[in-house]
A protein has these predicted regions:
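Interfacial loop-to-helix transition and helix-capping segments at the boundaries
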Residues: 169-175, 205, 238
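Bacterial N-terminal signal peptides
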Residues: 13-26
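Initiator methionine at the very start of the polypeptide chain
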Residues: 1, 29-30
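N-terminal secretory signal peptides that target proteins for export/translocation
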Residues: 1-11
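Outer membrane beta-barrel
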Residues: 31-165, 174-178, 182-190, 244-248, ...
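Disordered, low-complexity tails and leader-like regions
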Residues: 3-4, 19, 299
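Positively charged, low-complexity intrinsically disordered regions
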Residues: 9, 13-14, 291
Length: 339
């Protein structure tokens, strides 16, 4: 009887193991993968000297997917960023349940709002000073996020990263970069705040971000501010802000289905990237202001989007400053294809 009981118990356990294996295979069989990308081709001409160029601003490709309901991945690269190849993102994400998620790999540090817009979702042909110069940071590290489940629909994200650039992953260091980001939607508004501390060289740089976004009907508006403080260095604090509005109307009986108009004012005081030269920080970007106006004609049928965009940018510098090509008054015409 004992032998028969043992046999039955063994058979029961084997059946349970086989069933769980079949279920696991079923979960794997339900994997989902998708390939996407965006191409941005442009022509721009400087209005002061008539110099112009054609360029492929981005030719970005990505693949994303999941191997089971709570495990996903994302990889992206830019095959032509103004002629240069860039490997951008590679990470895995684990949904632990109850609003908790973990992400590890190479990705954008969780800080700021405008920097998180991809080239297929830019509001303007050129990124804001905040998105391009002040906080354009990808790094290798890990982050954890928590989304409140009940009364407060907020998400809080905390990340820890290597201080070196993504092209120098063999560098060992005694310091780390840290970032904290909180997002709270309130009706048509979304309030975002964050703190970040990085050390790209021997000087630590502390940053604080605040942003309010609004979206209702065809109107979208946003105002973002970043304070950047250089610890134990005489370089003055950098103040950056970005304010913009977009208004779109639907179109019927045409190839395109949306027409929108945009306006933006962004600025920053003198800025350093945090790299020390001759014992102290140097200025990488001068104090500047910019006014941008534009219009976009778009066909949107997710996940496909095609846009024709025209922008005029007016720059303001201190008297006597000779702005480099691309950072002067100009008109930009761009074709964007997202798939």
């Amino acid at each position: 009887m004992d032998l028969l009981f043992s046999f039955r118990e063994c058979a029961r356990r084997c059946a349970a193991l086989l069933f769980s294996g079949v279920m696991a295979l079923g979960a794997v069989a339900q994997t989902a993968h998708a390939i996407g990308g965006v191409v941005r081709a442009r022509y721009e001409i400087q209005t002061l000297d008539g110099r112009s160029r054609f360029a492929i601003r981005n030719s970005r490709v990505w693949i994303r997917g999941s191997f089971m309901p709570r495990l996903s991945y994302y990889v992206s690269t830019d095959l032509c960023d103004q002629g240069a190849f860039q490997f951008l993102d590679a990470y895995g994400k684990l949904d632990l349940g109850r609003g908790v998620a973990m992400q590890a790999g190479q990705f954008r540090i969780p800080f700021g709002v405008d920097p998180f817009r991809g080239p297929g979702n830019y509001i303007f042909a050129d990124r804001s000073f905040i998105g391009r110069d002040i906080d354009n940071i990808r790094a290798d590290g890990v982050q954890a996020s928590y989304t409140f489940q009940k009364d407060i629909p907020a998400t809080v994200t905390l990340g820890v990263f290597s201080p070196n650039t993504i092209t120098d992953q063999n560098h060992w260091s005694k310091t780390l970069n840290y970032a904290l980001k909180a997002e709270l939607p309130v009706g048509p508004f979304k309030v975002t705040g964050g703190l970040q501390t990085i050390q790209p060289d021997s000087v630590r740089v502390n940053m604080a971000d605040a942003c309010v976004s609004f979206s209702k009907g065809g109107l979208t508006a946003e105002a973002e501010y970043i304070l950047e403080h250089y610890v134990a260095d005489p370089f003055p604090d950098c103040h950056s802000y970005n304010v913009w509005v977009d208004y779109g109307i639907p179109l019927e009986h045409t190839l395109f289905n949306r027409l929108s108009f945009q306006a933006r004012f962004d600025a920053s005081t003198s800025h350093s990237s945090g790299v020390v030269t001759n014992g102290r920080l140097s200025e990488d970007h001068p104090a500047r202001k910019r006014l941008t106006i534009g219009s976009t004609l778009g066909y949107v049928n997710k996940p496909v989007k095609c846009e024709l965009q025209v922008n005029y940018q007016k720059y303001f510098y201190k008297e006597g400053y000779a702005a480099p090509d691309g950072r002067q008054d100009k008109v930009v015409a761009e074709l964007i294809v997202l798939f």
